[in-house]
Amino acid sequence: MKIALLFSGQGMQYADMLPWMNPANPLLLQMQEQLHVPDWRAAMRDTRWASTNAHAQVVLTACALAAWQELQEHVPALQTSRRSLVAVAGYSIGELAAACVAGVLSA
């Protein structure tokens, strides 16, 4: 199995994105603490808050990395070898998540 990942940039965020993600994921909890919000989804319902760069970019990066963690747990090909991952790319702020997944940056 060959897998390629594309991480979106700002403008694609909304409160109900990634409904399957575990809300107790440490990356999401750390993000909430950094943004001083008890619930990132509730905060995202405020479109003004959600469109602020300082909020949206942190949310998108943390959510992308949390989704990557969960994907690794559920895709057997990624559990045994990262060689199945043939390409990662990101648009705008998504480039940070792509660089982390590629091993160029640490989360």
What are these regions (language model features)?
Residues M1-A107:
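FabD-like malonyl-/acyl-CoA
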